Amino acid sequence: MNIKNEINSIIQNLNKKEFTKAITTCEKLIKKKIKHTVIFNLYGLAYQKQGMFLESIKAFEKSIELQNDNYLAINNLAVSFKSINENKLAEKFYQECLRLKPDHVIAIINYANLKEKINKFEDAIKLYFKALKFKKEVNEVYIFLKLSDLYLSIGNFEKAKDFAQRVVKINPDYVAGHVQLSKFINYKDDSKHLLQMEKLIQKKTPQNNEIMDLSFSLGAAYEAKKNYEKAFTFFNQGNNLRRKEIRYDLNDHIKLQTSIIKIFEDVKELNIIKEPFKSKIIFICGMPRSGTTLIEQIISSHKEVLATGENNFLSTYIKENYLDNFLLLQKKIMRDIYSKNYFFQDFVSRSLSEHNFESQVFTDKSVQNFLWIGFIKLFFPNSKIIVTDRNPRDICLSIFKINFKNGFMNFAYSQKDIAKFYKLYFDLINYWKKLYPKEIYTVKYENLIYDRVAETKKLINFCDLKWDPNCLRHDKNKSVIKTASVSQARKPIYKSSLNLSDNYSKYLKEMFSLLKN
């Protein structure tokens, strides 16, 4: 048997995405007692490419056991640990890989991605700059776009714009570069880039996803110029294209919400209280685009509070442990309510640690928080729950204008689905308020805009925090922001978004009429 030929055959399988074939070949060789570090590394890669990370970890560990300086396997092992949120182990192995091979560019970029994930943005930026030293081996456009995104998230708009401009200069037809650059241009006074995007969209074929991305950017540009008819035309085009590429059934959400209410109708009589969680979490709940990012920025401007953004720890645990086909598993939930175990709390605690969040008070504004308010009250009784409220028309318009990357937001690309989802949200929030009337604080976005000082003081008081004047300077907050609201949340509170939906009344009749009813 020629081992070299077998290895080449496995590599060909991987290149063709024939992962099952690659695994079968590796297993045949392993059964023949062939112990070869490369074979186990390829075995791990085949599993990794299929999302089977635990299996891949075993294979990579065996590869490293056979050759402890196999930096390729060590890098791959780090990737798998990162994929299952074992971020500290991932960091350990990236460091080991780069100790053995300091110029391993793929590991440098992977390590930068990990740093970004755990909110070490300054470290991520340094690593991307390190990767740029190897010009022949890196895709400069990819790294410049990453740097632009990172600088945007930490509020350095000047550098973010500079790197977006570099992307467009290198590749004038690269849509992602133009979409990024559009975030920094004031189209009221500048039409040059808008015309560039219009020329670019005409070059693209209708099947191309890039038309969708450009459509949302052009919609925002025309809105800035107060040309609402053209803005709507582009937003509508982007939504129609996005809707065609996703599968979404609102009935799945109805099924989940009905299941939630049924469970908590049974639970509410139990009067069971778990021990307080070791840290206080301030859960910010609300419809997307209702002001949750602004509220998090205000609260996390307090010297004692750390923002964790949309961390999704609650959703992850609930979906992995209590949910099956959009139905909650009542027996498992009841078992954990009655038991003395703290698996849920331990998972959240470890997740906070793995993502480098160290504080006694956190904010969590994950997009699905409003679904899990009952779980929050049961398992995190010392938490605070804030609900953001805003003109429903403005919320729904704002959703219509965004090309979200979050699968939970698949309702966002149809006027009818947006309005119906909002009504379901409204019903559930009212259910929670009746269930926990004294424990949910509602912040009205419009009140905050018109009476910032008084509303901010009431908000901080509800959180049982001492007054900190920094909370009135949220635009100076250096917390990382990873959501679509990043630009607005970095600015002082502004009134321009109030009742913006009035400008779209004749274009969004379907959505607004459903909201009325």
What residue ranges belong to the model's regions?
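Phosphate-binding active sites in nucleotide-utilizing proteins
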Residues: 274-380
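PAPS-dependent sulfotransferases, especially Golgi type II membrane carbohydrate sulfotransferases
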Residues: 163, 182, 194-206, 214-282, ...
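Conserved alpha-helical positions within TPR/SEL1-like repeat arrays
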Residues: 11, 38-49, 72-83, 106-116, ...
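Conserved phosphate-donor/acceptor-positioning beta-strand/loop module used by diverse small-molecule
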Residues: 376-399
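Short coil turns that delineate tetratricopeptide repeat
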Residues: 34, 68, 102, 136-138, ...
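Register position in tetratricopeptide repeats
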Residues: 15, 49, 83-84, 117-118, ...
